Design a protein with these regions (language model features):
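Short gly/pro-enriched beta-turn/loop segments at secondary-structure junctions
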Residues: 55-57, 113-118, 162-164
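Catalytic-loop motifs flanking and including active-site residues across diverse enzymes
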Residues: 32, 118, 182
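Glycine-rich, aromatic-lined ligand/substrate-binding cores of catalytic
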Residues: 67-150, 154
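Conserved anion/nucleotide-ligand pocket segment
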Residues: 14-97
Length: 192
């Protein structure tokens, strides 16, 4: 969904693998699923419980997509969207995920729109001063991303029915935005 030109973020360190960071590759890796499969297979990134296991290398065939170009977003492919997760209901959710998804793993630290109609688009909590948070984030002058104040009550999940305050983010220039770092700037701002 992010196209094939965006590559950014840290690589997971050995010993810190998880469901969302299984391989030593950047958080945003700029590859198609087929290219990723080839890289994992050819570079020996498959590993067993004790590390690299050459027996896990397989005979792999990848069929290239017709008409796809690296600069294309998912929407530009014209393909219908198929939900990879209930919390990623539309292509923009997948585009926003790298900007907030890590924050969502911190056990209810901040609500990122899950349980509401804006999954992966917000950073909010009951205790946040939304105006102060927006002002702090605006002072960082982050390229390609902007924030607006938001107040909402999730309709599902651990924050269901709670009035949350915070910011909704949106891209003003996706190519210029360092989307992976956004969530870390937000965490810095809420802890000031």
């Amino acid at each position: 969904p992010l196209g094939g030109l965006k590559v950014e973020g840290c690589c997971v360190e050995p010993g810190y693998y998880s469901f969302v960071s299984e391989f030593e590759i950047p958080y945003i890796y700029g590859l198609t699923v087929g290219e990723l499969a080839i890289m994992i297979n050819e570079e020996g990134l498959n590993r067993g419980e004790k590390g690299y296991d050459p027996a896990l290398k397989c005979k792999l065939s990848v069929i290239p997509m017709d008409g796809w170009r690296r600069k294309m977003s998912y929407i530009e492919t014209g393909l219908p969207w198929v939900l990879p997760s209930p919390n990623i209901p539309y292509p923009q959710s997948a585009v926003n995920y790298p900007s907030s998804g890590i924050t969502g793993e911190f056990n209810n630290y901040l609500n990122i729109g899950i349980g509401y109609t804006l999954p992966f688009e917000t950073f909010a909590a009951e205790w946040i001063d939304a105006g102060a948070l927006k002002k702090e984030l605006d002072s960082y002058n982050l390229p390609g991303i902007a924030f607006r104040i938001i107040h909402y009550k999730p309709i599902a999940g651990s924050s269901k029915g709670k009035l949350l305050h915070g910011v909704q983010f949106y891209y003003t220039d996706y190519e210029a935005a360092d989307i992976t770092l956004t969530q870390f700037y937000v965490m810095q701002a809420v802890n000031r």
